Amino acid sequence: AQGIQTYRCNPDNTANNFCTLSGIQTNSPSTVISSGALRVDSSANSGVAYGTVGIPTTGKWYFETHIDERSAYNHLGIQAEALPEYTGVYRVLLREDGNVYGNSGQLGTAGWSVVPNDVVGVGVDSDAGKVYFWKNGGSQTSAWDIYNFGFANPRGSESYRAYFLGGDGTGATFNFGQDCTFRGQKTGTFNKDANGIGEFLYSVPTGYKALCASNFPEPQVKDPSLHFQNILYQGTAETAKEVSGLKFKPDFAIVFNRQITHPRSVYDVIRGGNQQQNINEPDATVTRAPFGLAFTDDGFSVSTGGNSNNGNAYVAHCWKAGGPAVPNNDGSVLSMVSVNQDAGFSIIRAYAQTSGSITLGHGLNKPPVFWFYTPYTGGTNWYIYHKSLGAEAWLQPDNSTAATTGNNAAWAVSPTDTILTHGSGFVNQKDIIFYAWTEIPGYSSFGEYEGNGNSWGPVIITGFKPALVIIKSVDFVDDWTVYDNVRNDKNLADNIYYLNTEGDENLDDSSHGIDFLSNGFKCRGTSNQENKDGGRIIYMAWAESPFKYAQAK
């Protein structure tokens, strides 16, 4: 009997995921990913394939590409996807004729061309911001600069990925360390990377590593559920309800009634459990007796005196901050903060100015990239800062309006490692509160993407499998759409609600659906809220599991 051919057995497994080609991020049905997601074939011009994982912004990284079929349009190397606010595409690509192209056009030439059966090695020195190419294990090319490597890509913290562009009738097989025979097309020599991992046809350059989970740095937050969780519960309407099952004592919660028209209630540790405010309304804080929601060691208790125990089904999104607030004097006025630096979350309370602007210390030790803001007294809408919009723009989570831009009245200047600014447009607001996050790779991601209006929508790389995703169109009047992993335990994730309204849950609404991936999410719906053709859309996402340890749904 004949055994299974060795090239059909890859070392990729849940303990050490290798990069592959993304079968859900090709640019058209004419681009086909096959052979264990390592081969790409294009039957039309400009067939595109991306690697599934981002190239880390530190270290040295290596992969190989076998040219199966060639055309005048073959390009391979690394590329970051086009983004709404940038002109052009960030890339370093080798064309089949040996010319090397970057963001601004041709960079130079490799001094050789490639033909079918050639193998091109690609080395990315992230520390130096350089790319190298090797042909059939020969001498390396010149060092090609990566344009603006490590730039703040709104799609995630990892900007560049392996990339192939092919014309009609072209094909290539990649090896990220899984198969040095390229699906039986070469006799394997099984060279290892710098850590003794993988199998490559040619010797791996000194210090270079395979794009696989074992080689990636440990995430700052290995277990996101120690800092953030969604939880479902059923209200009782008659008695206080104990909700347990969290791995931490929460300090901030957004509670949504899934079955009836109802506000989206917010509770936090600084104001206390008897103080409720609704994120979808410009109303003042409401005092609930005996309490609305009281945080416990592994959850919370909701009373009959609040809006979060009306006998219906609920979901609560819960974050851990730092417990009772402590003084912070980093700003121009005193702030009281409850901060969790490990997970990048801070609750900030202060007293507003009567003129001009003030600065507030936030305690994160990194610039916050997203926050909710509201005064206690009501009468003023909630406001949102998002890094993709900048300091002269804002959105409001209590309505569906497009972003206000070109106005510095709210924030005035961008936040720093220590402070954020409360602008001159917010005078005489008395007690104010911020819920602010900074980005923690592998745990939280705040960015933007461009919709395409069809069910083969964009893939957004966050670096983790999401537990919670909130999406909002920047340019158009559209609702804030919320997805989570407890109301959507499988793909398609199409049980949604809107943060800015009082409506109940939309079930099985495929026009708004997304897929949760091991490293991000993909838009499957065609609605304007999440995927308007050409629309600029921001997102906020928190993790169920970092990519290094994730398994997709």
Regions found by a protein language model. Give the residues of each.
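Surface-exposed molecular-recognition determinants
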Residues: A1-K60, H66-S71, A82-K553
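Active-site region of the double-stranded beta-helix
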Residues: N74-A80
